[in-house]
């Protein structure tokens, strides 16, 4: 007789994954949640723009600011893009289910770093006393973003074949860890006397 298992129904959902991009891809690729510190999540406001992007008749950079729906910032102004992962995941799926998804499968939203690049670039120009021309702002802003997320951007570009410094990333939620584990008491002992489960092996500590 084995040890009892608990909480098999609890599953983490990770909102920041590279979506499926073709028939050859067997699973979604996990990206770091840290990207939401600086990236702004959006989909087109107009259905015709979403369709045009899916059909590759439009690029995301061609969608003007006023035609972008930063839906997390709109729905949760106090938290914006830093809402809890379950909220971000549900909101992304809702937008995609409503027909606003932006990749070929309709299961992706944009994670855009243009605002962060501009903000960091202006800060760096001010710090170093440099004229904040558009080119200088972008160059210095991209350096800061590269220092923070360069390895993730490199991984994304290798998989998707698009430069995330210039074009918004595409992301979509994916199932992550199963939260269940071996049942333990307050002393971390399982239902097998003398057998203990410590850390993520037990049901309560993941």
Regions found by a protein language model. Give the residues of each.
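An anion/pyrophosphate-binding glycine-rich loop and adjacent beta-alpha core
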Residues: 4-155
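A conserved FAD-binding loop/helix module that cradles the flavin
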Residues: 1, 205-206
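Short, glycine-/Ser/Thr-/acidic-enriched flexible segments
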Residues: 46-49, 77, 116-118, 176-177, ...
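Residues forming anionic-ligand binding surfaces in small-molecule and nucleic-acid pockets
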Residues: 1, 112, 200
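Short coil/turn connectors at secondary-structure junctions
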Residues: 2-3, 36-38, 105-107, 160, ...
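A glycine-rich dinucleotide-binding beta-alpha-beta segment and adjacent secondary-structure elements
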Residues: 145-203
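Flexible domain-boundary/linker segments
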Residues: 15, 204-205
């Amino acid at each position: 007789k084995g040890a009892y298992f608990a909480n098999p129904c609890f599953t983490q959902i990770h909102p920041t994954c590279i979506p499926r991009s073709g028939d050859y891809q067997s699973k979604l690729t996990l990206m770091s949640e840290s990207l939401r510190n600086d990236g702004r999540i959006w989909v087109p406001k107009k259905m015709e723009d979403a369709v045009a992007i899916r059909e590759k008749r439009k690029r995301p950079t061609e969608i003007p600011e006023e035609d972008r729906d930063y839906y997390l910032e709109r729905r949760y102004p106090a938290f914006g893009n830093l809402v809890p992962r379950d909220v971000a995941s549900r909101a992304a799926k809702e937008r995609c289910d409503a027909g606003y998804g932006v990749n070929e499968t309709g299961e992706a939203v944009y994670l855009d770093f243009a605002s962060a690049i501009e903000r960091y670039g202006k800060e760096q120009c001010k710090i170093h006393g440099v004229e904040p021309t558009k080119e200088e702002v972008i160059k210095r802003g991209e350096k800061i973003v590269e220092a923070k997320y360069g390895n993730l951007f490199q991984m994304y570009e290798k998989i998707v074949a698009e430069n995330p410094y210039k074009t918004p990333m595409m992301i979509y939620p994916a199932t992550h860890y199963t939260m269940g584990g071996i049942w333990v008491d307050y002393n971390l002992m399982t239902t097998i006397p003398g057998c203990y489960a410590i850390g993520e092996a037990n049901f309560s500590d993941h």
